[in-house]
Amino acid sequence: MGSTDQATAPAGPAVSISAKLFEDACAVIPGGVNSPVRAFSAVGGTPLFITEARGCWLTDADGRRYVDLVCSWGPMILGHAHPAVVDAVATVAASGLSFGAPTPAETQLAAEIIGRMAPVERIRLVNSGTEATMSAVRLARGFTGRTKIIKFSGCYHGHVDALLADAGSGVATLSLPSSPGVTGAAAADTIVLPYNDIEAVRQTFARLGDQIAAVITEASPGNMGVVPPAPGYNAALRAITAEHGALLIIDEVMTGFRVSRSGWYGLDPVAADLFIFGKVMSGGMPAAAFGGRAEVMERLAPLGPVYQAGTLSGNPVAMAAGLATLRAAADAVYATLDRNADRLVAMLSEALTDAGVPHQIPRAGNMFSVFFSEAPVTDFASACNSQVWRYPAFFHALLDAGVYPPCSTFEAWFVSAALDDAAFGRIVDALPGAAAAAVAARHRES
Protein backbone atom coordinates (compact mmCIF):
# COMPACT_ATOMS: atom_id res chain seq x y z
CA MET A 1 0.00 0.00 0.00
CA GLY A 2 1.45 3.36 -0.95
CA SER A 3 0.80 6.92 0.14
CA THR A 4 -1.98 8.86 -1.56
CA ASP A 5 -1.69 12.26 -3.19
CA GLN A 6 -3.56 13.93 -0.34
CA ALA A 7 -0.92 12.75 2.13
CA THR A 8 2.29 13.93 0.56
CA ALA A 9 5.33 13.16 2.69
CA PRO A 10 7.64 15.97 3.82
CA ALA A 11 10.42 16.79 1.40
CA GLY A 12 13.05 19.44 0.85
CA PRO A 13 15.29 21.34 3.24
CA ALA A 14 15.26 21.46 7.01
CA VAL A 15 12.12 22.65 8.77
CA SER A 16 13.10 26.29 8.53
CA ILE A 17 9.96 27.90 9.95
CA SER A 18 9.89 25.49 12.91
CA ALA A 19 13.58 26.20 13.48
CA LYS A 20 12.91 29.94 13.58
CA LEU A 21 9.91 29.46 15.86
CA PHE A 22 12.02 27.31 18.18
CA GLU A 23 14.71 29.99 18.27
CA ASP A 24 12.06 32.59 19.16
CA ALA A 25 10.61 30.30 21.83
CA CYS A 26 14.03 29.71 23.41
CA ALA A 27 14.33 33.46 23.93
CA VAL A 28 11.27 33.56 26.20
CA ILE A 29 10.59 29.96 27.35
CA PRO A 30 13.24 27.82 29.13
CA GLY A 31 14.45 25.33 26.55
CA GLY A 32 11.83 26.60 24.11
CA VAL A 33 9.16 24.18 25.35
CA ASN A 34 6.63 23.92 28.16
CA SER A 35 7.19 20.20 28.76
CA PRO A 36 10.73 18.81 28.42
CA VAL A 37 10.05 15.78 26.21
CA ARG A 38 8.86 18.10 23.42
CA ALA A 39 12.37 19.49 22.98
CA PHE A 40 13.60 16.36 21.12
CA SER A 41 16.41 16.11 23.70
CA ALA A 42 16.53 12.32 23.46
CA VAL A 43 16.65 12.21 19.66
CA GLY A 44 18.33 15.47 18.68
CA GLY A 45 17.18 17.99 16.13
CA THR A 46 14.64 20.78 16.21
CA PRO A 47 11.12 20.09 17.44
CA LEU A 48 8.32 20.60 14.95
CA PHE A 49 5.89 23.43 15.63
CA ILE A 50 2.40 22.18 14.84
CA THR A 51 -0.18 24.58 13.47
CA GLU A 52 -3.12 22.29 12.72
CA ALA A 53 -4.34 18.77 13.38
CA ARG A 54 -7.28 16.94 11.83
CA GLY A 55 -8.11 13.28 12.13
CA CYS A 56 -4.80 11.40 12.27
CA TRP A 57 -2.80 14.11 10.47
CA LEU A 58 -0.60 16.86 11.89
CA THR A 59 0.48 19.90 9.88
CA ASP A 60 3.63 21.76 10.88
CA ALA A 61 4.52 25.42 10.44
CA ASP A 62 6.09 24.63 7.05
CA GLY A 63 2.88 23.05 5.79
CA ARG A 64 4.20 19.48 5.95
CA ARG A 65 1.84 16.71 7.01
CA TYR A 66 2.59 13.79 9.31
CA VAL A 67 0.76 10.69 10.49
CA ASP A 68 0.26 11.27 14.20
CA LEU A 69 1.28 8.32 16.39
CA VAL A 70 1.50 10.43 19.56
CA CYS A 71 -2.08 11.76 19.78
CA SER A 72 -1.07 14.60 22.13
CA TRP A 73 0.51 11.90 24.35
CA GLY A 74 -2.70 9.91 24.50
CA PRO A 75 -5.91 11.92 24.75
CA MET A 76 -6.98 12.08 21.12
CA ILE A 77 -8.59 8.66 20.76
CA LEU A 78 -11.18 10.00 18.31
CA GLY A 79 -8.59 11.85 16.25
CA HIS A 80 -8.01 15.59 16.16
CA ALA A 81 -10.79 18.15 15.73
CA HIS A 82 -13.53 15.55 16.03
CA PRO A 83 -16.78 17.36 15.12
CA ALA A 84 -18.66 16.32 18.26
CA VAL A 85 -15.88 17.65 20.50
CA VAL A 86 -15.30 20.84 18.51
CA ASP A 87 -19.04 21.60 18.47
CA ALA A 88 -19.40 20.98 22.20
CA VAL A 89 -16.46 23.25 23.02
CA ALA A 90 -17.68 26.01 20.71
CA THR A 91 -21.18 25.93 22.17
CA VAL A 92 -19.99 26.16 25.77
CA ALA A 93 -17.28 28.75 25.04
CA ALA A 94 -19.89 31.04 23.50
CA SER A 95 -21.62 31.17 26.90
CA GLY A 96 -18.49 31.97 28.93
CA LEU A 97 -15.12 30.44 29.68
CA SER A 98 -15.02 30.20 33.48
CA PHE A 99 -17.38 31.10 36.30
CA GLY A 100 -15.73 30.09 39.56
CA ALA A 101 -19.01 28.40 40.45
CA PRO A 102 -20.52 24.95 39.96
CA THR A 103 -21.84 24.02 36.51
CA PRO A 104 -24.02 21.11 35.38
CA ALA A 105 -21.23 19.76 33.15
CA GLU A 106 -19.05 18.98 36.19
CA THR A 107 -21.70 16.65 37.58
CA GLN A 108 -22.33 15.12 34.16
CA LEU A 109 -18.65 14.33 33.56
CA ALA A 110 -18.24 12.93 37.08
CA ALA A 111 -21.30 10.72 36.54
CA GLU A 112 -19.95 9.53 33.18
CA ILE A 113 -16.67 8.46 34.80
CA ILE A 114 -18.43 6.76 37.71
CA GLY A 115 -20.66 4.92 35.25
CA ARG A 116 -17.59 3.41 33.58
CA MET A 117 -15.64 2.60 36.77
CA ALA A 118 -17.47 0.36 39.24
CA PRO A 119 -15.15 0.99 42.25
CA VAL A 120 -15.39 4.79 41.88
CA GLU A 121 -18.17 6.30 43.99
CA ARG A 122 -17.06 9.94 44.14
CA ILE A 123 -14.97 12.15 41.83
CA ARG A 124 -13.07 15.39 42.38
CA LEU A 125 -12.15 17.32 39.22
CA VAL A 126 -8.83 19.14 38.97
CA ASN A 127 -6.64 20.71 36.27
CA SER A 128 -3.80 18.25 35.63
CA GLY A 129 -2.60 14.74 36.35
CA THR A 130 0.09 16.15 38.62
CA GLU A 131 -2.55 17.96 40.67
CA ALA A 132 -4.69 14.82 40.85
CA THR A 133 -1.76 12.72 42.06
CA MET A 134 -0.68 15.30 44.62
CA SER A 135 -4.23 15.47 45.96
CA ALA A 136 -4.70 11.70 46.06
CA VAL A 137 -1.47 11.21 48.01
CA ARG A 138 -2.48 13.91 50.49
CA LEU A 139 -5.89 12.31 50.86
CA ALA A 140 -4.36 8.87 51.46
CA ARG A 141 -2.18 10.27 54.21
CA GLY A 142 -5.08 12.18 55.72
CA PHE A 143 -7.37 9.16 55.64
CA THR A 144 -4.89 6.66 57.11
CA GLY A 145 -2.97 8.97 59.45
CA ARG A 146 0.24 7.49 58.03
CA THR A 147 3.05 9.14 56.10
CA LYS A 148 4.96 6.74 53.85
CA ILE A 149 4.15 6.14 50.18
CA ILE A 150 5.46 3.30 48.01
CA LYS A 151 6.05 4.07 44.34
CA PHE A 152 7.82 2.07 41.66
CA SER A 153 10.97 2.76 39.70
CA GLY A 154 10.10 4.05 36.23
CA CYS A 155 6.51 4.96 37.08
CA TYR A 156 5.70 8.63 36.56
CA HIS A 157 2.93 10.37 38.46
CA GLY A 158 3.46 13.97 37.43
CA HIS A 159 6.09 16.35 38.74
CA VAL A 160 5.08 16.04 42.41
CA ASP A 161 8.21 16.48 44.56
CA ALA A 162 7.65 13.35 46.61
CA LEU A 163 7.12 11.15 43.53
CA LEU A 164 9.87 12.30 41.15
CA ALA A 165 12.43 9.86 42.55
CA ASP A 166 13.41 7.27 39.91
CA ALA A 167 10.52 8.42 37.74
CA GLY A 168 9.77 7.77 34.10
CA SER A 169 8.57 10.07 31.28
CA GLY A 170 10.75 13.15 30.79
CA VAL A 171 12.81 12.29 33.86
CA ALA A 172 13.82 9.02 32.17
CA THR A 173 14.20 10.64 28.76
CA LEU A 174 16.66 13.18 30.17
CA SER A 175 18.42 10.52 32.32
CA LEU A 176 17.70 12.37 35.56
CA PRO A 177 17.53 10.50 38.91
CA SER A 178 15.14 13.07 40.32
CA SER A 179 15.34 16.87 40.19
CA PRO A 180 17.29 19.62 41.90
CA GLY A 181 14.92 21.48 44.15
CA VAL A 182 13.37 18.30 45.52
CA THR A 183 14.50 18.31 49.12
CA GLY A 184 15.41 15.29 51.16
CA ALA A 185 12.52 16.10 53.43
CA ALA A 186 10.05 16.08 50.53
CA ALA A 187 11.14 12.61 49.47
CA ALA A 188 11.91 11.19 52.92
CA ASP A 189 8.60 9.35 53.15
CA THR A 190 8.76 7.98 49.60
CA ILE A 191 9.87 4.37 49.23
CA VAL A 192 10.93 3.43 45.69
CA LEU A 193 10.75 -0.25 44.79
CA PRO A 194 11.50 -2.09 41.54
CA TYR A 195 8.44 -2.52 39.33
CA ASN A 196 6.90 -5.99 38.88
CA ASP A 197 8.70 -7.31 42.00
CA ILE A 198 5.86 -8.24 44.33
CA GLU A 199 8.22 -9.87 46.84
CA ALA A 200 9.92 -6.51 47.40
CA VAL A 201 6.51 -5.06 48.24
CA ARG A 202 5.76 -7.85 50.71
CA GLN A 203 9.10 -7.43 52.43
CA THR A 204 8.67 -3.67 52.73
CA PHE A 205 5.23 -4.04 54.28
CA ALA A 206 6.60 -6.66 56.67
CA ARG A 207 9.04 -4.04 57.98
CA LEU A 208 7.04 -0.82 57.70
CA GLY A 209 3.43 -1.80 57.18
CA ASP A 210 2.00 0.33 59.98
CA GLN A 211 3.67 3.45 58.52
CA ILE A 212 2.62 3.06 54.88
CA ALA A 213 -0.32 5.21 53.81
CA ALA A 214 -0.54 4.01 50.23
CA VAL A 215 1.00 2.25 47.28
CA ILE A 216 0.76 4.23 44.04
CA THR A 217 1.28 2.56 40.69
CA GLU A 218 0.49 3.20 37.06
CA ALA A 219 -2.29 0.81 36.06
CA SER A 220 -0.01 -0.37 33.27
CA PRO A 221 3.09 1.78 33.08
CA GLY A 222 3.63 3.84 29.96
CA ASN A 223 6.22 6.30 31.20
CA MET A 224 9.28 4.04 31.10
CA GLY A 225 7.95 2.99 27.77
CA VAL A 226 5.04 0.60 27.94
CA VAL A 227 5.84 -2.13 30.49
CA PRO A 228 2.70 -4.06 31.46
CA PRO A 229 2.24 -5.47 34.95
CA ALA A 230 2.95 -9.16 35.33
CA PRO A 231 -0.24 -11.25 35.50
CA GLY A 232 -1.78 -10.84 38.94
CA TYR A 233 0.59 -8.04 39.96
CA ASN A 234 -2.04 -5.35 40.57
CA ALA A 235 -4.28 -7.86 42.34
CA ALA A 236 -1.40 -8.77 44.64
CA LEU A 237 -0.86 -5.09 45.43
CA ARG A 238 -4.56 -4.88 46.31
CA ALA A 239 -4.31 -7.85 48.66
CA ILE A 240 -1.16 -6.61 50.41
CA THR A 241 -2.44 -3.06 50.95
CA ALA A 242 -5.78 -4.31 52.23
CA GLU A 243 -4.06 -6.66 54.67
CA HIS A 244 -2.04 -3.81 56.15
CA GLY A 245 -4.69 -1.08 56.14
CA ALA A 246 -2.98 0.97 53.44
CA LEU A 247 -4.67 2.43 50.37
CA LEU A 248 -4.01 1.39 46.78
CA ILE A 249 -3.86 4.27 44.30
CA ILE A 250 -3.98 3.27 40.63
CA ASP A 251 -2.90 5.96 38.18
CA GLU A 252 -4.99 5.65 35.01
CA VAL A 253 -3.99 8.99 33.52
CA MET A 254 -2.61 7.19 30.43
CA THR A 255 -4.76 4.07 30.30
CA GLY A 256 -8.03 5.53 31.55
CA PHE A 257 -10.76 5.38 28.87
CA ARG A 258 -8.09 4.66 26.24
CA VAL A 259 -7.38 0.93 26.47
CA SER A 260 -11.09 0.19 27.04
CA ARG A 261 -14.20 2.16 27.92
CA SER A 262 -13.29 1.46 31.56
CA GLY A 263 -9.55 1.92 31.10
CA TRP A 264 -7.14 -0.66 32.45
CA TYR A 265 -9.79 -1.56 35.05
CA GLY A 266 -11.86 -2.94 32.17
CA LEU A 267 -9.02 -5.33 31.29
CA ASP A 268 -7.78 -6.09 34.81
CA PRO A 269 -10.59 -5.34 37.29
CA VAL A 270 -8.65 -4.55 40.46
CA ALA A 271 -10.66 -2.30 42.78
CA ALA A 272 -8.25 0.35 44.02
CA ASP A 273 -9.24 2.72 46.81
CA LEU A 274 -8.38 5.71 44.61
CA PHE A 275 -7.96 6.12 40.86
CA ILE A 276 -6.34 8.99 38.97
CA PHE A 277 -7.62 10.08 35.56
CA GLY A 278 -6.55 12.54 32.88
CA LYS A 279 -5.84 12.78 29.15
CA VAL A 280 -8.84 11.08 27.46
CA MET A 281 -11.34 12.23 30.10
CA SER A 282 -10.49 15.84 29.25
CA GLY A 283 -10.76 15.47 25.48
CA GLY A 284 -7.41 17.20 25.01
CA MET A 285 -8.17 20.10 27.36
CA PRO A 286 -6.35 20.75 30.67
CA ALA A 287 -8.39 18.72 33.15
CA ALA A 288 -7.95 15.63 35.30
CA ALA A 289 -9.65 13.91 38.21
CA PHE A 290 -9.19 11.57 41.13
CA GLY A 291 -11.88 9.43 42.65
CA GLY A 292 -12.67 6.31 44.58
CA ARG A 293 -14.50 4.96 47.59
CA ALA A 294 -16.98 7.39 49.13
CA GLU A 295 -15.59 6.72 52.60
CA VAL A 296 -12.18 7.96 51.47
CA MET A 297 -13.28 10.78 49.16
CA GLU A 298 -15.57 12.30 51.78
CA ARG A 299 -12.56 13.18 53.89
CA LEU A 300 -11.98 15.99 51.37
CA ALA A 301 -13.03 19.55 52.18
CA PRO A 302 -15.72 20.79 52.49
CA LEU A 303 -16.99 17.52 54.00
CA GLY A 304 -13.75 16.59 55.74
CA PRO A 305 -10.45 18.03 56.91
CA VAL A 306 -8.22 17.20 53.90
CA TYR A 307 -7.89 20.40 51.91
CA GLN A 308 -7.91 20.54 48.12
CA ALA A 309 -9.01 23.38 45.86
CA GLY A 310 -8.56 24.96 42.43
CA THR A 311 -9.77 28.18 40.82
CA LEU A 312 -10.22 26.58 37.39
CA SER A 313 -11.17 23.07 38.51
CA GLY A 314 -14.24 21.89 36.63
CA ASN A 315 -13.72 24.49 33.90
CA PRO A 316 -16.84 24.36 31.70
CA VAL A 317 -14.97 24.28 28.38
CA ALA A 318 -12.76 21.39 29.52
CA MET A 319 -15.81 19.58 30.91
CA ALA A 320 -17.54 19.93 27.54
CA ALA A 321 -14.55 18.48 25.69
CA GLY A 322 -14.24 15.56 28.08
CA LEU A 323 -17.93 14.76 28.13
CA ALA A 324 -18.19 14.89 24.33
CA THR A 325 -15.17 12.63 23.97
CA LEU A 326 -16.42 9.99 26.39
CA ARG A 327 -19.93 10.03 24.93
CA ALA A 328 -18.52 9.58 21.42
CA ALA A 329 -16.21 6.77 22.57
CA ALA A 330 -18.60 3.89 21.94
CA ASP A 331 -17.56 0.25 21.90
CA ALA A 332 -16.92 0.49 18.16
CA VAL A 333 -14.28 3.16 18.80
CA TYR A 334 -12.36 0.86 21.14
CA ALA A 335 -12.60 -2.00 18.64
CA THR A 336 -11.12 0.30 16.00
CA LEU A 337 -8.33 1.43 18.33
CA ASP A 338 -7.40 -2.19 19.02
CA ARG A 339 -7.46 -3.10 15.31
CA ASN A 340 -5.30 -0.10 14.45
CA ALA A 341 -2.80 -1.00 17.16
CA ASP A 342 -2.72 -4.63 16.01
CA ARG A 343 -2.06 -3.52 12.44
CA LEU A 344 0.63 -1.02 13.36
CA VAL A 345 2.47 -3.39 15.72
CA ALA A 346 2.45 -6.11 13.05
CA MET A 347 3.88 -3.68 10.49
CA LEU A 348 6.59 -2.51 12.89
CA SER A 349 7.56 -6.01 13.90
CA GLU A 350 7.70 -7.23 10.30
CA ALA A 351 9.91 -4.35 9.18
CA LEU A 352 12.28 -4.66 12.13
CA THR A 353 12.47 -8.44 11.81
CA ASP A 354 13.17 -8.20 8.08
CA ALA A 355 15.97 -5.73 8.82
CA GLY A 356 17.44 -8.02 11.47
CA VAL A 357 17.27 -5.50 14.29
CA PRO A 358 16.52 -6.91 17.77
CA HIS A 359 13.31 -5.48 19.16
CA GLN A 360 10.55 -5.85 21.72
CA ILE A 361 7.12 -4.25 21.36
CA PRO A 362 5.39 -4.61 24.74
CA ARG A 363 1.71 -3.66 24.76
CA ALA A 364 -0.94 -2.46 27.15
CA GLY A 365 -4.11 -2.77 25.11
CA ASN A 366 -3.76 -0.31 22.22
CA MET A 367 -0.70 1.40 23.77
CA PHE A 368 2.77 0.06 23.03
CA SER A 369 6.45 0.97 22.88
CA VAL A 370 9.37 0.00 20.66
CA PHE A 371 12.52 -1.14 22.44
CA PHE A 372 15.62 -2.28 20.60
CA SER A 373 16.45 -5.26 22.78
CA GLU A 374 17.02 -9.01 22.58
CA ALA A 375 15.62 -9.50 26.09
CA PRO A 376 12.05 -8.84 27.25
CA VAL A 377 11.45 -5.48 28.92
CA THR A 378 9.74 -6.04 32.27
CA ASP A 379 10.87 -3.12 34.45
CA PHE A 380 12.74 0.18 34.38
CA ALA A 381 16.16 -1.46 34.56
CA SER A 382 15.53 -3.63 31.50
CA ALA A 383 14.06 -0.63 29.65
CA CYS A 384 17.24 1.35 30.35
CA ASN A 385 19.37 -1.63 29.28
CA SER A 386 17.80 -1.69 25.82
CA GLN A 387 19.75 -0.30 22.86
CA VAL A 388 18.40 3.20 23.41
CA TRP A 389 21.02 4.60 21.03
CA ARG A 390 19.24 3.05 18.02
CA TYR A 391 16.06 5.02 18.61
CA PRO A 392 17.11 8.52 17.39
CA ALA A 393 18.00 7.25 13.90
CA PHE A 394 14.77 5.24 13.77
CA PHE A 395 12.76 8.26 14.91
CA HIS A 396 14.25 10.71 12.43
CA ALA A 397 13.89 8.32 9.50
CA LEU A 398 10.18 8.03 10.27
CA LEU A 399 9.84 11.77 10.80
CA ASP A 400 11.59 12.55 7.52
CA ALA A 401 9.14 10.22 5.78
CA GLY A 402 6.11 11.96 7.26
CA VAL A 403 5.37 9.78 10.29
CA TYR A 404 5.37 11.38 13.77
CA PRO A 405 6.27 8.80 16.47
CA PRO A 406 7.11 9.54 20.12
CA CYS A 407 10.46 11.30 20.46
CA SER A 408 11.85 8.92 23.10
CA THR A 409 12.05 5.17 23.48
CA PHE A 410 10.73 5.72 27.03
CA GLU A 411 7.37 6.98 25.77
CA ALA A 412 4.26 5.20 24.52
CA TRP A 413 2.98 5.08 20.96
CA PHE A 414 -0.69 6.01 20.67
CA VAL A 415 -3.14 5.34 17.86
CA SER A 416 -6.44 7.06 17.18
CA ALA A 417 -9.63 5.69 15.68
CA ALA A 418 -9.10 8.14 12.81
CA LEU A 419 -6.10 6.33 11.30
CA ASP A 420 -6.98 5.81 7.63
CA ASP A 421 -5.63 3.88 4.65
CA ALA A 422 -3.52 6.84 3.54
CA ALA A 423 -1.91 6.95 6.97
CA PHE A 424 -1.13 3.24 6.97
CA GLY A 425 0.21 3.58 3.45
CA ARG A 426 2.54 6.33 4.61
CA ILE A 427 3.74 4.14 7.48
CA VAL A 428 4.32 1.12 5.20
CA ASP A 429 6.44 3.28 2.90
CA ALA A 430 8.44 4.72 5.82
CA LEU A 431 9.23 1.59 7.81
CA PRO A 432 11.91 -0.12 5.68
CA GLY A 433 14.10 2.99 5.71
CA ALA A 434 13.51 3.53 9.42
CA ALA A 435 14.40 -0.08 10.23
CA ALA A 436 17.56 0.23 8.11
CA ALA A 437 18.48 3.41 9.98
CA ALA A 438 18.10 1.58 13.31
CA VAL A 439 20.40 -1.19 12.05
CA ALA A 440 23.00 1.31 10.87
CA ALA A 441 22.99 3.30 14.12
CA ARG A 442 26.20 3.11 16.12
CA HIS A 443 26.57 3.34 19.88
CA ARG A 444 28.62 6.30 21.04
CA GLU A 445 29.86 6.28 24.62
CA SER A 446 28.97 9.48 26.46
Swiss-Prot record:
The keyword Cytoplasm applies. It is found in: Cytoplasm. CDD domains: OAT_like (cd00610). GO terms for biological process: protoporphyrinogen IX biosynthetic process. Its cofactor is pyridoxal 5'-phosphate. GO terms for molecular function: glutamate-1-semialdehyde 2,1-aminomutase activity; pyridoxal phosphate binding; transaminase activity. Pathway: Porphyrin-containing compound metabolism; protoporphyrin-IX biosynthesis; 5-aminolevulinate from L-glutamyl-tRNA(Glu): step 2/2. It catalyses: (S)-4-amino-5-oxopentanoate = 5-aminolevulinate. The modification N6-(pyridoxal phosphate)lysine is found at residue 279. GO terms for cellular component: cytoplasm. Its EC number is 5.4.3.8. The keyword Cytoplasm applies. It is an enzyme of class 5 (isomerase). InterPro entries: 4pyrrol_synth_GluAld_NH2Trfase, Aminotrans_3, Aminotrans_3_PPA_site, PyrdxlP-dep_Trfase, PyrdxlP-dep_Trfase_major, PyrdxlP-dep_Trfase_small. Homodimer. NCBIfam families: hemL, PRK00062.1. This is Glutamate-1-semialdehyde 2,1-aminomutase. It comes from Mycobacterium leprae (strain TN). The lineage of its organism: Bacteria, Bacillati, Actinomycetota, Actinomycetes, Mycobacteriales. The gene is hemL.
